[in-house]
Amino acid sequence: MPCRREEEEEAGDEAEGEEDDDSFLLLQQSVTLGGSTDVDRLIVQIGETLQLDTAHDRPASPCAAPGPPPAPPRVLAALSADKTGTPARRLLRPTGSAETGDPAPPGAVRCVLGERGRVRGRSAPYCVAEIAPGASALPGPGRRGWLPGSVASHRIQQRRWTAGGARAADDDPHRLLQQLVLSGNLIKEAVRRLQRAVAAVAATSPASAPGSGGGRSGPDSVTLQPSGAWL
């Protein structure tokens, strides 16, 4: 009797194993035989079922008007794009981009990274700001006139400031002050003028006699003159 029970158990285990093998083969056969059209059809059916389930789960209000059906999921659009041969990554780009031909609004600033014909000089690996046509000039580094090349040329022009140019612009003190501030020579010019004023006062002041002034000694008074007298 124990031998028969063991044989029956072994036979039952073998039968279960054969059933498992058959089901595995059937499952594998059903998956491998299906083509791309079957897979697309199955995905469409699953999407429709999910939409129907969500529509049934929502409580329908009696006052609400029937609205348009919900939009299909983006997975189906991606699958259809793959089926037609177009790259699916185009779906990730926002609508109304530069590729569709829509012009940018006036004043829009965009960054150009490595585009040929637009990046010049040493700013090739960096972001160069460009203003859309029809926009006014923006202040600050976003303006085209403040690119590295123009800044360098502007500094070179400031260094070429000479005494002759200062004499010519002496009639306008605001312009002279602006030139000194831009060139960075404001402090140097102030020290130079103070030294000239002290030397001029020392040369024009009469020598004080010894004992005069009641024994009072102190620094000479310095009178500052207009800038035109020294230049």
UniProtKB/Swiss-Prot annotation:
Instruction: Provide an example Pfam family for this protein.
Output: GSK-3_bind
Task: Return the annotated region ranges for Disordered.
Answer: 1-24, 53-109, 203-231
Query: Does this entry carry the keyword Cytoplasm?
Result: no
- Region annotated Involved in GSK-3 binding, chain positions: 172-194
A biological-process GO annotation: canonical Wnt signaling pathway
Gene Ontology CC terms: cytoplasm; nucleus
Keyword annotations of the record: Wnt signaling pathway
Q: Where is the composition biased (Acidic residues)?
A: 7-23
Subunit structure, as described in the record: Binds GSK-3 and prevents GSK-3-dependent phosphorylation.
State its role: Positively regulates the Wnt signaling pathway by stabilizing beta-catenin through the association with GSK-3.
Q: Which family does it belong to?
A: Belongs to the GSK-3-binding protein family.
The name of this protein is: GSK-3-binding protein FRAT2
Q: To which species is this protein native?
A: Mus musculus
What is this organism's lineage?
Answer: Eukaryota, Metazoa, Chordata, Craniata, Vertebrata
Name of the gene this protein is made from? Frat2
